[in-house]
Design a protein with these regions (language model features):
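Short glycine/proline- and aromatic-enriched beta-strand/turn motifs that initiate or cap beta-hairpins
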Residues: 1-45, 127, 135-139
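Ser/Thr- (and often Asn-) enriched beta-sheet segments in non-cytosolic proteins
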Residues: 3, 24, 86-88, 117-119, ...
Length: 139
């Protein structure tokens, strides 16, 4: 499955917000037990750019033929450039994921994914975010 959408993040440590697009691919190695999602998100704010790549391990639950909910956790690599200072850091992320499909064939739908992130790098930044957008099922 392919996820294409937008993302917003708010640093709880620095009290600043960032916005940008997001793209992720999700596969199901163990039906009804495990889904893996790898995604990339560039976030922008004045004088700062942050690129993140995450790998989430998700447990899915089917609520109906057209609704699913998942909880995921995983590592994240972050490259940031703020005021010319470049930095790499590692973070941990936890996300609930809500999916709504247009039909039970799961070809097209939309998703909403709130998140909490903790950076293990300098400053130990905490942030909350939300992403949402279009789901495209890949047969």
């Amino acid at each position: 499955m392919l996820e294409i959408g937008g993302a917003a993040s708010r640093s709880l440590t620095e009290s600043q917000s960032s916005f940008g697009p997001t793209l992720a691919v999700e596969v199901t190695p163990i039906e009804k037990w495990l889904e893996l999602e790898i995604g990339v998100t560039p976030l922008f704010r004045p004088h700062s750019t942050e690129w993140s790549v995450d790998l989430l391990f998700k447990k899915p639950w089917t609520l109906s033929d057209t609704k699913e909910v998942m909880i995921g956790i995983g590592p994240e690599w972050i490259y940031s450039n703020a005021y010319g200072i470049k930095m790499n850091s590692v973070a941990g992320e936890i996300v609930p994921d809500f999916m709504f499909w247009s039909s039970k064939k799961h070809r097209f739908g939309w998703y909403l994914e709130p998140s909490y992130e903790y950076k293990f790098g300098p400053g130990h930044e905490h942030s909350i975010g939300i992403s949402g957008g279009l789901l495209i099922g890949i047969p």
